[in-house]
């Protein structure tokens, strides 16, 4: 009976509260795991979240290429994965692509 009362109170608190728990929130890259960086959220202004490094075809920013970056990032995208390059495409956008200079033909 006590357990049921506790669960009821917890559910009541969850439904009444005006907050959310955000996992993956960060301030700097060193707080994120391998293969991620601390980028600005597109949805919540002022929030930074651990975000995966850019894969081939994903948007990137040419000035954002260091991981870890020891200050606060100013972009919503992470640098590309180590084997990729942030390249400008004909449509004017920057995307992660293969570094053709390092391929042996």
UniProtKB/Swiss-Prot annotation:
One of its GO terms (cellular component) is extracellular region. GO terms for molecular function: growth factor activity. It holds the Pfam family Prokineticin. Disulfide bonds join 26-38, 32-50, 37-78, 60-86, 80-96. Residues 1-19 form the signal peptide. Localizes to glandular epithelium, stroma and vascular epithelial cells of first trimester decidua (at protein level). Up-regulated in first trimester decidua when compared with non-pregnant endometrium. Expressed in the steroidogenic glands, ovary, testis, adrenal and placenta. Keywords: Angiogenesis, Disulfide bond, Growth factor, Mitogen, Secreted, Signal. InterPro entries: Prokineticin, Prokineticin_domain. GO terms for biological process: angiogenesis; endothelial cell proliferation; positive regulation of cell division; positive regulation of MAPK cascade; positive regulation of vascular endothelial cell proliferation; regulation of angiogenesis; vascular endothelial cell proliferation. It is found in: Secreted. Belongs to the AVIT (prokineticin) family. Potently contracts gastrointestinal (GI) smooth muscle. Induces proliferation, migration and fenestration (the formation of membrane discontinuities) in capillary endothelial cells derived from endocrine glands. Has little or no effect on a variety of other endothelial and non-endothelial cell types. Induces proliferation and differentiation, but not migration, of enteric neural crest cells. Directly influences neuroblastoma progression by promoting the proliferation and migration of neuroblastoma cells. Positively regulates PTGS2 expression and prostaglandin synthesis. This is Prokineticin-1. It comes from Homo sapiens (Human). The lineage of its organism: Eukaryota, Metazoa, Chordata, Craniata, Vertebrata. The gene is PROK1.
């Amino acid at each position: 009976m006590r357990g049921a009362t506790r669960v009821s109170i917890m559910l009541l608190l969850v439904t009444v509260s005006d907050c959310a728990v955000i996992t993956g929130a960060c301030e700097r890259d060193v707080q994120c795991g391998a293969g991620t960086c601390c980028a600005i959220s597109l949805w919540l202004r002022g929030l930074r979240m651990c975000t995966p490094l850019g894969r081939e075809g994903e948007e990137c920013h040419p000035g954002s290429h260091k991981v870890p970056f020891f200050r606060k990032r100013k972009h919503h995208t992470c640098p590309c994965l180590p084997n990729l390059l942030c390249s400008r495409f004909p449509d004017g956008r920057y995307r992660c692509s293969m570094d053709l200079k390092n391929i042996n033909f």
